[in-house]
């Protein structure tokens, strides 16, 4: 039941004028996190607009900010807050939180209703706007969402800039002050920012987007950002069209909050805000590592005439079986392609020299299953027909590529894709797509997503630097699974690095490539390099390959252990009783101190792989660790380290 609001606090219109007077005292509509540290507050600006404010430890991380919608081309005018309803925290595995539903209505004109739903978690806060269903025909034609997020000071952020809506969502999370954001640019999610109050860090993103477009951020009117919805492809002036009887819900406008920047990578907030699983029986979904032939250029020693053919694919399958990998990803090139056009690939037929059912049987006999690359448009023409065929072939999963969109139609496509794939017991990896919005909770068969400037950029650029790799751990990696495809073993220095498309190099040490398997979350981890990079013809393992055989792809517990924002990071993840630690550094040589407070009581046997004398070398160390131990670890330029800890 809605309770009548006795009074409504008024928020200053600081986003419009340079100075403002203190708001009059009143009773706000607010909800706190279970630990009491985070509070999200609803109220009205002096202009009458609906607003939110987010506070952490009693101080603003998001200053009073107007939120709203523009349905049918008309923005909401001044509103009255009619009441609110406290929502009991849901059960069923959802993280504990406080929730408040606020009901507002326009004072004049159409007196349209507008709902504002607030949530506060220990890891941050979120809000979403809702238009209630109407008992009449017709559509809601949404022109824009007018929400903004104002900052109380000039934050230092990591941001990816795009020039247009249609893009691969790949780029460098470059350092930028909010005051220096470009007015004409679209900024991708997440926007990760140091607030300037100690080591406190926040990140702005979204979750739970359905029947609604994905959002970008743009420079706000003052310090801060505003939301910019991706328009429908055939109507630049429209963001969404929905039946009035259905109503409308925005995505959750999400703010992650952490006391220290490295703690952000352990956040589950984006996942927790998404809708619960819609797959009733998910026992067939199996995380794991995969061999993969595309990055090296389908070139490997030991295979005459290596290329898009059965002998080459069998070689990768044999390697996966010997190396203990449950999967082999067959990337583009296997399907029949009329006129050689990838977008016209017939993903139900294979090219001459390739026999997918035979390869699937060959792999199954060796304990390996296949993933198949598909073009998003080709597979979208008749999903159930294509996926039923793949199920008969024994395929484990699909890699869907070249979407490049996050408009309302594309968001609905992702939901349809994952639901159809689940009906046919197929796991999914989405490429050329936006960053995660929590869909892996709603559809657990979504194993990983791209939306990252990953290892492939070594094939044609100098962009995948160690500094970029570290910044990913403080930005893109904090919102969900990330298919960076680590494991490049032709390691060299930035000065010696040469761009080449076949058998590419990487400008990090071997140990940094190993650390990515711990630092970057991805329940499907594809080993980028050719089999010959990991094991030579005599069966000898390359330095670090022994670690790759041991590291899992899924985790039971995660801690951001230590770091310096954008410069280096240490992450600990637990699988069963075993802990793995990954450390990554930028181009600077340094010695870092790693605390082991995350360990339980007792003694732990440690094995470590650290930077060796050359980029391709690792040095091994063994020892005994206790809870509370601190280790000093040297990092070479563009370096890293990994550790495995077992109960003694």
Predicted regions and their residues:
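Bacterial N-terminal signal peptides that target proteins for export
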Residues: 1-10
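C-terminal motif of bacterial Sec signal peptides marking the signal peptidase cleavage site
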Residues: 17-19
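An acidic-aromatic substrate-binding cleft motif
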Residues: 245-327
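Glycine-rich, aromatic-lined ligand/substrate-binding cores of catalytic
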Residues: 497-562, 566-575
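Carbohydrate-binding surface patches
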Residues: 564-601, 641-644
């Amino acid at each position: 039941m809605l309770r009548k609001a006795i009074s409504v606090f008024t928020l200053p219109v600081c986003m419009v004028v340079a100075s403002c007077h203190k708001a009059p005292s009143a009773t706000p509509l607010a909800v706190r996190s279970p630990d009491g540290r985070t509070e999200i507050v609803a109220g009205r600006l002096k202009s009458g607009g609906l607003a939110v404010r987010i506070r952490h430890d009693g101080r603003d991380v998001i200053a009073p900010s107007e939120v709203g919608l523009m349905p049918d081309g008309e923005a909401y005018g001044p509103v009255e807050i009619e009441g609110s309803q406290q929502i009991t925290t849901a059960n069923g595995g959802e993280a504990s939180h406080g929730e408040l539903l606020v009901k507002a209505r326009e004072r004049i004109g159409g007196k349209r209703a507008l709902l504002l739903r607030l949530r506060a978690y220990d890891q941050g806060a979120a809000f979403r706007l809702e238009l209630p269903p109407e008992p009449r025909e017709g559509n809601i034609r949404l022109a824009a969402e007018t929400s903004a997020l104002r900052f109380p000071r000039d934050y230092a952020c990591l941001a990816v800039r795009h020039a247009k809506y249609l893009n691969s969502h790949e780029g460098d999370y470059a350092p930028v002050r909010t005051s220096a954001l470009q007015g004409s640019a679209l900024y991708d999610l997440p926007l990760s920012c140091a607030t300037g109050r100690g080591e406190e860090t926040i990140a702005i993103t979204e979750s739970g987007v359905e029947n609604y477009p994905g959002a970008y951020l743009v420079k706000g009117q003052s310090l801060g950002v505003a939301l910019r919805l991706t328009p429908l492809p055939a109507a630049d002036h429209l963001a969404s069209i929905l039946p009035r009887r259905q109503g409308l819900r925005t995505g959750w406008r999400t703010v992650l909050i952490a006391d220290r920047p490295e703690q952000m990578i352990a956040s589950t907030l984006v996942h927790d805000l998404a809708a619960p699983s819609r797959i009733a029986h998910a026992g067939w979904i199996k995380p794991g590592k995969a061999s993969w032939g595309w990055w090296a250029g389908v070139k490997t020693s030991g295979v005459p005439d290596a290329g898009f053919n059965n002998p080459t694919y069998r070689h990768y399958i044999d390697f996966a079986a010997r190396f203990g990998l449950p999967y082999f990803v067959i990337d583009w090139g296997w399907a029949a392609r009329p006129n050689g056009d990838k977008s016209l690939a017939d993903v139900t037929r294979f090219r001459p020299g390739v026999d997918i059912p035979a390869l699937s049987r060959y792999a199954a006999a060796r304990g390996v299953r296949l993933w198949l690359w598909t073009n998003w448009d080709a597979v979208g023409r008749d999903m159930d027909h294509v996926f039923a065929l793949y199920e008969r072939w024994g395929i484990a999963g699909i890699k869907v590529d070249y979407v490049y969109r996050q408009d309302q139609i594309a968001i609905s496509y992702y939901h349809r894709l994952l639901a159809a794939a689940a009906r046919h017991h197929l796991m999914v990896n989405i490429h050329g797509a936006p960053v995660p919005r929590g869909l892996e909770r709603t559809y657990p068969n979504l194993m990983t997503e791209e939306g990252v400037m990953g290892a492939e950029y070594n094939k044609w650029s100098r962009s995948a630097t160690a500094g970029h790799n570290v910044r990913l751990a403080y930005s893109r990696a904090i919102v969900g699974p990330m298919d960076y495809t680590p494991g490049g073993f032709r390691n060299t220095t930035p000065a010696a690095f040469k761009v080449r498309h076949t058998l590419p190099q990487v400008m990090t040490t071997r140990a940094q490539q190993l650390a990515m398997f711990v630092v970057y979350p991805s329940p499907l981890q594809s080993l980028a390099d050719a089999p010959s990079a990991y094991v030579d013809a005599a069966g000898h393992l390359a330095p670090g390959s022994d670690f790759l055989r041991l590291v899992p792809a899924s985790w039971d517990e995660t801690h951001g252990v230590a770091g310096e924002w954008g410069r280096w990071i240490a992450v600990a993840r637990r699988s069963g009783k075993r802990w793995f630690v990954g450390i990554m550094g930028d181009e600077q040589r340094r010695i870092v101190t790693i605390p082991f407070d995350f360990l339980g009581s007792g003694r732990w046997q440690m094995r470590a792989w650290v930077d060796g004398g050359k980029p391709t070398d690792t040095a091994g160390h063994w020892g005994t660790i206790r809870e509370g131990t601190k280790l000093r670890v040297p990092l070479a330029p563009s370096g890293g380290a990994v550790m495995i800890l077992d109960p003694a």
